[in-house]
């Protein structure tokens, strides 16, 4: 009895949504073109970081080789982007990674993904709103901050902000009102601001190549000494590297690439438009790939121009572009850069706010969050309640809280979503070409089929069928789960025991070699299984290699987070599990459908019994 109850409970946690190939019906308005999705992706990804990040990384980590950092970071990010693109072509819904997890690995993982996406978008919105407020305040001489500091102070360091940011509050509420007007209106504003941002960045890149000097990529120690002697008469070269194009060596490039990786986060907002894109199976993959390519060109071009205009060690880490234009004698250009920065912050803010209610709506429609969040406006066809609720929460966060310590928490949610999407692509590529059934139906079907199919060594490495079967699909499912565990263990070892590995400690080197051997062997089993041949507008190439590399990169970056960040993540997940086990698991649409099916079955049984009784009595 207890075993059956536990079995039913476990089945609830892994029950999956039906995989619907095609667009299907939606209550939202299909009004977004491919251009709208590209603008949304570029605007969300190409935020204020392009105006700040290049200076910080070039000065302290990579020097002129920052261009290679952005190339490495782009290649790492594009792995996750390709996985999102395939799912956008295969499962065009509004839930992004939440929906992809639900149709592949089950309800509990889907809730975990969606819950963390909500946190990421809320923190992202609030932090960008405060950055917008700070940038505007800086333009007008810091009058806003000085006035508020002199009248209202919040004396709770590391929890509340130094002062309440009324400007950030008003900005988030204003953009919430814009989102309420409909997806087409917000898409138009995004296109305008993204276009202005790209024009400013084009001016920066062209100006940099005109005014730049190639000698700034070939600096020597003599140049460093000359600079130091002009400043204070000393020659401390430790912080400047060893000269040349790669002054900090390969290690500097890798450290810089890890920082630059976060510059490409944001494209996943395109995946939340599956129910509003006119042709999602084509537009979502194209939008993701094109937007990532544009962002790479922008980052690559700006970092090249910046390091050509002035020596990297003279860059100002907080405002590199204005300082670079002052260095080459183009002082008025700093105002154009300021306008571009505000446009970038505006599109980044919209890019964080747009997907937030879509994820809430998708989860509420499935019953995992409160159903009221799934209410859609009859005129604008947007999730009205989810939009208002998410906007108010983000505005409140921007108004009161110090968000510096929460940015890493936002990164965990994003990286977890990227990892799960990569795993889901790996699993779904090898599943039979059929709609996913409920857990109970699938288990019955599998038991019948597996009686005919037996797991042998030949089935692992030389399967007979050229198309996926239930057995080959289950093999890939188990192997993918094992690979996820092994990759996590590998990342833990590489993070916590770096020193003994570098020194060649035979114990830890053996451990790493064994883990890599197991990963290669299990990957070989997956590689030998037949793939699903359903035609899609886009498919990830080199499966299973690329999804596995994507998982490794994302998990490794997650392991770099501090213990405090993981503690906050644990608290957030406890709140989420309280909602899921207290509400979602009972109100899930899968649960409701099961309860609706049972009475019908019982009614048919009663009718049959009554009919039989009547026959006997006659």
UniProtKB/Swiss-Prot annotation:
GO terms for biological process: L-arginine import across plasma membrane; L-arginine transmembrane transport; L-lysine import across plasma membrane; L-lysine transmembrane transport; L-ornithine import across plasma membrane. Pfam families: AA_permease_2, AA_permease_C. The modification Phosphoserine is found at residue 617. Residues 58-61, 129-162, 213-244, 307-335, 402-406, 496-506, 561-568 are extracellular. It is found in: Cell membrane. The chain crosses the membrane at residues 37-57, 62-82, 108-128, 163-183, 192-212, 245-265, 286-306, 336-356, 381-401, 407-427, 475-495, 507-527, 540-560, 569-589. The keyword Zinc does not apply. One of its GO terms (molecular function) is L-ornithine transmembrane transporter activity. Residues 1-36, 83-107, 184-191, 266-285, 357-380, 428-474, 528-539, 590-618 are cytoplasmic. The keyword ATP-binding does not apply. It catalyses: L-arginine(in) = L-arginine(out); L-lysine(in) = L-lysine(out); L-ornithine(in) = L-ornithine(out). InterPro entries: AA/rel_permease1, Cat_AA_permease, CAT_C. Keywords: Amino-acid transport, Cell membrane, Glycoprotein, Membrane, Phosphoprotein, Transmembrane, Transmembrane helix, Transport. Glycans are attached at residue 232. Uniporter that mediates the uptake of cationic L-amino acids such as L-arginine, L-lysine and L-ornithine. The transport is sodium ions- and pH-independent, moderately trans-stimulated and is mediated by passive diffusion. This is Cationic amino acid transporter 3. It comes from Mus musculus. The lineage of its organism: Eukaryota, Metazoa, Chordata, Craniata, Vertebrata. The gene is Slc7a3.
